[in-house]
């Protein structure tokens, strides 16, 4: 371990988070973390990308997983020539495959840049604006809630209890006239 970096058991190089670097109570190496039964924190920017399973959380299983059979189907008794069916299958599959690759090559990096900026702004606003506003509101509303609670218990509770006692002796009887 040198210069704020360490290597895990698989040989991956990780940076030590800034918060962890100066804290003597938190271990910076795996052996010490295991010894103290603490979870090792990894830097999110150095994790590996799985090039085989590109949708590990199954976000697009039901949306864009469209095959030839999902789009084009010939019912029994209405079949085209076998050669046409095979050529249609090949044309559809190859066109979809290469056109997707072309679109992702042209627009993938710009779209990743746009979405990265968007989610960075969204995260920034959530961390630095939304959560502090909500916390501030909860602190301010706490004093109002105490006053409101006192008002309910001293004014509304006795009032509605008295109204309830007044109407508790009211009896309604329904008779059907023939």
Curated annotation (Swiss-Prot):
<feature type="modified residue" description="Phosphotyrosine">
    <location>
        <position position="25"/>
    </location>
</feature>
<dbReference type="GO" id="GO:0042383">
    <property type="term" value="C:sarcolemma"/>
</dbReference>
<keyword id="KW-0832">Ubl conjugation</keyword>
<dbReference type="InterPro" id="IPR001612">
    <property type="entry name" value="Caveolin"/>
</dbReference>
<dbReference type="GO" id="GO:0031295">
    <property type="term" value="P:T cell costimulation"/>
</dbReference>
<dbReference type="GO" id="GO:0045121">
    <property type="term" value="C:membrane raft"/>
</dbReference>
<dbReference type="GO" id="GO:0005768">
    <property type="term" value="C:endosome"/>
</dbReference>
<feature type="cross-link" description="Glycyl lysine isopeptide (Lys-Gly) (interchain with G-Cter in ubiquitin)">
    <location>
        <position position="30"/>
    </location>
</feature>
<feature type="lipid moiety-binding region" description="S-palmitoyl cysteine">
    <location>
        <position position="143"/>
    </location>
</feature>
<feature type="cross-link" description="Glycyl lysine isopeptide (Lys-Gly) (interchain with G-Cter in ubiquitin)">
    <location>
        <position position="47"/>
    </location>
</feature>
<keyword id="KW-0597">Phosphoprotein</keyword>
<keyword id="KW-1017">Isopeptide bond</keyword>
<dbReference type="InterPro" id="IPR018361">
    <property type="entry name" value="Caveolin_CS"/>
</dbReference>
<feature type="lipid moiety-binding region" description="S-palmitoyl cysteine">
    <location>
        <position position="133"/>
    </location>
</feature>
<dbReference type="GO" id="GO:0019901">
    <property type="term" value="F:protein kinase binding"/>
</dbReference>
<dbReference type="GO" id="GO:0030154">
    <property type="term" value="P:cell differentiation"/>
</dbReference>
<keyword id="KW-0333">Golgi apparatus</keyword>
<dbReference type="GO" id="GO:0000139">
    <property type="term" value="C:Golgi membrane"/>
</dbReference>
<feature type="modified residue" description="Phosphotyrosine; by ABL1">
    <location>
        <position position="14"/>
    </location>
</feature>
<feature type="region of interest" description="Interacts with SPRY1, SPRY2, SPRY3 and SPRY4">
    <location>
        <begin position="167"/>
        <end position="178"/>
    </location>
</feature>
<feature type="cross-link" description="Glycyl lysine isopeptide (Lys-Gly) (interchain with G-Cter in ubiquitin)">
    <location>
        <position position="57"/>
    </location>
</feature>
<dbReference type="GO" id="GO:0070836">
    <property type="term" value="P:caveola assembly"/>
</dbReference>
<comment type="subunit">
    <text>Homooligomer. Interacts with GLIPR2. Interacts with NOSTRIN. Interacts with SNAP25 and STX1A. Interacts (via the N-terminus) with DPP4; the interaction is direct. Interacts with CTNNB1, CDH1 and JUP. Interacts with PACSIN2; this interaction induces membrane tubulation. Interacts with SLC7A9. Interacts with BMX and BTK. Interacts with TGFBR1. Interacts with CAVIN3 (via leucine-zipper domain) in a cholesterol-sensitive manner. Interacts with CAVIN1. Interacts with EHD2 in a cholesterol-dependent manner.</text>
</comment>
<dbReference type="GO" id="GO:0060090">
    <property type="term" value="F:molecular adaptor activity"/>
</dbReference>
<protein>
    <recommendedName>
        <fullName>Caveolin-1</fullName>
    </recommendedName>
</protein>
<keyword id="KW-0449">Lipoprotein</keyword>
<dbReference type="GO" id="GO:0031623">
    <property type="term" value="P:receptor internalization"/>
</dbReference>
<dbReference type="GO" id="GO:0001937">
    <property type="term" value="P:negative regulation of endothelial cell proliferation"/>
</dbReference>
<feature type="modified residue" description="N-acetylserine">
    <location>
        <position position="2"/>
    </location>
</feature>
<feature type="modified residue" description="Phosphotyrosine">
    <location>
        <position position="6"/>
    </location>
</feature>
<feature type="intramembrane region" description="Helical">
    <location>
        <begin position="105"/>
        <end position="125"/>
    </location>
</feature>
<feature type="region of interest" description="Interacts with SPRY1, SPRY2, SPRY3 and SPRY4">
    <location>
        <begin position="131"/>
        <end position="142"/>
    </location>
</feature>
<dbReference type="GO" id="GO:0008142">
    <property type="term" value="F:oxysterol binding"/>
</dbReference>
<keyword id="KW-1003">Cell membrane</keyword>
<feature type="cross-link" description="Glycyl lysine isopeptide (Lys-Gly) (interchain with G-Cter in ubiquitin)">
    <location>
        <position position="39"/>
    </location>
</feature>
<dbReference type="Pfam" id="PF01146">
    <property type="entry name" value="Caveolin"/>
</dbReference>
<dbReference type="GO" id="GO:0051480">
    <property type="term" value="P:regulation of cytosolic calcium ion concentration"/>
</dbReference>
<feature type="modified residue" description="N6-acetyllysine; alternate">
    <location>
        <position position="5"/>
    </location>
</feature>
<feature type="region of interest" description="Interaction with CAVIN3">
    <location>
        <begin position="82"/>
        <end position="94"/>
    </location>
</feature>
<feature type="modified residue" description="Phosphoserine">
    <location>
        <position position="9"/>
    </location>
</feature>
<dbReference type="GO" id="GO:0005901">
    <property type="term" value="C:caveola"/>
</dbReference>
<feature type="lipid moiety-binding region" description="S-palmitoyl cysteine">
    <location>
        <position position="156"/>
    </location>
</feature>
């Amino acid at each position: 371990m040198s210069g704020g970096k360490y290597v895990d058991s698989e040989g991956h190089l990780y940076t030590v988070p800034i918060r962890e670097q100066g804290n003597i109570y938190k271990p910076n190496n795996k052996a010490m973390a295991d010894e103290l039964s603490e979870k090792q924190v990894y830097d999110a920017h150095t994790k590996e990308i799985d090039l085989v399973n590109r949708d590990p959380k199954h976000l697009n299983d039901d949306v864009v997983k469209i095959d030839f059979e999902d789009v084009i189907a010939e019912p029994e008794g209405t079949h085209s020539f076998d050669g046409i069916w095979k050529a249609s299958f090949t044309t559809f599959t190859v066109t979809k495959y290469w056109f997707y690759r072309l679109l992702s090559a042209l627009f993938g990096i710009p779209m990743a840049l746009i979405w990265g900026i968007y989610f960075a702004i969204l995260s920034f606003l959530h961390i630095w604006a939304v959560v502090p506003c909500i916390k501030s509101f909860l602190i301010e509303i706490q004093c109002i809630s105490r006053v409101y609670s006192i008002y309910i218990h001293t004014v509304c509770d006795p009032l509605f209890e008295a109204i309830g006692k007044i109407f508790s002796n009211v009896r309604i009887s329904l008779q059907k006239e023939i």
